């Protein structure tokens, strides 16, 4: 299982936004929508072993968590408007501390970063930062990972403190800063290649060069 957390600091926490203006009226919700697509879609299918968690911290009610479960997800297309519509439907639910299903495979609840991290107890937490350890060096040893990414503003000092206190390793996918959705694609590629080397992907045939 792969879980991916994206923190949206300005992402609106009510459903009264326009699907035609996700960058503006929805508080850069377009960034989160692109992350959802990069995390879940394959060329001719969907990654059923991936969950995406969107932590929305914008107005008017900061602290909403929307979860996309790849195993059960339906009605999602690769375009931003499609994922934006599912997010909007989730936000129109009267979310509380317990998960509420809005559409098949999409759940919503209230919560903050600490409560979200607590739900991953026992998992391998990996926090992406430009100066982190090269993920390529450890991708083959990682099991049951949870990746945490910021939006276009990164993460705050307080959020980083919470991540490090929770035991998150700091990793990087390359020497330059990339968009969050591009980082997700690179993460998947490294893990896919590692699984292919181990024979865990049907038809996979990638040989690792001799050291």
Curated annotation (Swiss-Prot):
S-adenosyl-L-methionine binds at residues 128, 150, 183. CDD domains: TrmY-like. It catalyses: pseudouridine(54) in tRNA + S-adenosyl-L-methionine = N(1)-methylpseudouridine(54) in tRNA + S-adenosyl-L-homocysteine + H(+). GO terms for biological process: tRNA methylation. It comes from the Archaea. GO terms for molecular function: S-adenosylmethionine-dependent methyltransferase activity; tRNA methyltransferase activity. One of its GO terms (cellular component) is cytoplasm. The keyword Calcium does not apply. Keywords: Cytoplasm, Methyltransferase, S-adenosyl-L-methionine, Transferase, tRNA processing. It holds the Pfam family Methyltrn_RNA_2. Its EC number is 2.1.1.257. It is found in: Cytoplasm. Homodimer. Specifically catalyzes the N1-methylation of pseudouridine at position 54 (Psi54) in tRNAs. Belongs to the methyltransferase superfamily. TrmY family. HAMAP family: tRNA_methyltr_TrmY (MF_00587). This is tRNA (pseudouridine(54)-N(1))-methyltransferase. The gene is trmY.
């Amino acid at each position: 299982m792969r879980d991916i957390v994206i923190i949206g600091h300005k992402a609106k926490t009510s459903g009264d936004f326009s699907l035609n203006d996700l960058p503006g009226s929805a508080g850069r919700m377009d960034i989160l929508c692109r992350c959802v697509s990069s995390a879940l879609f394959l060329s001719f299918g969907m990654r059923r072993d991936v969950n995406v968690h969107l932590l929305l911290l914008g107005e008017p009610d900061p602290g909403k968590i929307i979860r996309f479960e790849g195993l059960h997800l339906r009605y999602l297309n690769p375009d931003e408007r499609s994922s934006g519509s599912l997010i909007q439907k989730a936000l129109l639910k009267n979310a509380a501390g317990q998960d509420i299903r809005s559409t098949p495979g999409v759940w919503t609840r209230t919560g903050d970063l600490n409560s979200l991290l607590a739900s991953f107890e026992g998992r391998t937490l990996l926090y992406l930062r430009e100066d982190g350890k090269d993920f390529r060096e450890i991708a083959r040893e990682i099991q049951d990972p949870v990746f945490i990414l910021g939006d276009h503003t990164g993460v705050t000092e307080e959020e980083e403190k919470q991540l490090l206190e929770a035991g998150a390793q700091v990793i990087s996918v390359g020497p330059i800063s990339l968009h969050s959705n591009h980082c997700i694609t690179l993460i998947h590629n490294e893990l896919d290649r590692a699984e292919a080397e181990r024979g865990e992907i049907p038809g996979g045939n990638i040989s690792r060069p001799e050291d």
